[in-house]
A protein has these predicted regions:
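Outer-membrane beta-barrel translocator domains and adjoining extracellular loop/strand segments
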Residues: 1-5, 54-63, 117-123, 130-131, ...
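Transmembrane beta-strands of outer-membrane beta-barrel proteins
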Residues: 1, 45-47, 107-109, 168-172, ...
Length: 238
């Protein structure tokens, strides 16, 4: 009772904030590598990613509160449903064996940013008619399909593997050119141009103490994220 100040807390009502949903992914891929010579190795592949979203019917959060507090007795549901989208994703890289203990590499890969259905679907505008909430407009599966946002990533790295010392350093850069927003005027989901980038440097060092089970190590990651606004890159808070 100490956290509640000695009061006996009771649940008045329970509401849901977002519609229930499930996500199914299917992603077959092909990947291969080829040794050009003793120094260089090429690698590459392709992946097909298919995603299906199933969303439950849902009553708006504010309308659930209104029913729970007695302001209304019932409400229309925002219809659920299912939608799917797919992407072909590619990757390629080259690895160079500088010495028996040192390697450097450059990789390009594509990923897909999967939107959260609960963040977009289940939004609606209602009007109270008598003791019933009538649905006017809504963001629903039938009217607005989500799609994956493709992300291109690049990485340049180097590593050293010694008997006791192991270290690695890599620079990375990733870009995307779209984002998903809700148009509140007509309650639809829009995919709009939106240039964003994330880049940084990361590294790690490990030292294994001889004749013991102990090791010392450390790592770091310096990252910066930016979004293009009015033709200029600005800080992007993520």
């Amino acid at each position: 009772s100490l956290p509640s100040g000695g009061m006996d807390n009771r649940t008045a009502y329970t509401t849901g904030r977002y519609p229930g949903y499930s996500i199914t992914n299917f992603a077959p891929f092909l990947q291969n590598s080829y040794d050009i010579n003793d120094i260089f190795t090429l690698s590459g592949g392709v992946r097909y990613q298919w995603t299906e979203n199933r969303v439950d019917d849902f009553v708006g959060y504010a309308q659930q509160q209104g029913i729970a507090t007695g302001l209304a007795n019932s409400a229309d549901t925002i219809p659920g449903g299912k939608t799917d989208y797919d992407n072909f994703l590619f990757n390629a890289g080259i690895l160079a064996h500088l010495t028996d203990r040192q390697q450097t590499w450059f990789n390009f890969s594509q990923g897909v940013e999967l939107p959260d259905p609960g963040k977009y679907y289940g939004n609606g505008t209602y009007s109270l008619v008598g003791d019933h909430y009538q649905l006017q407009r809504s963001v629903n599966v039938a009217d607005s399909r989500l799609e994956g946002i493709k992300v291109n990533s690049y990485e340049l790295g180097w590593r050293y593997t010694g008997d006791s010392l192991r270290t690695q350093l890599a620079a990375y850069y990733s870009t995307s050119d779209k984002s998903i927003i809700i148009n509140r005027s007509d309650m639809t989901i829009n995919v709009q141009p939106d240039d964003r980038r994330i880049y940084g440097i990361e590294g790690a060092v490990d030292y294994f103490i001889a004749d013991t089970d102990w090791s010392l190590g450390g790592n770091f990651n310096v990252i910066k994220s930016e979004v293009k606004q009015n033709g200029k890159w600005q800080k992007w808070d993520v």
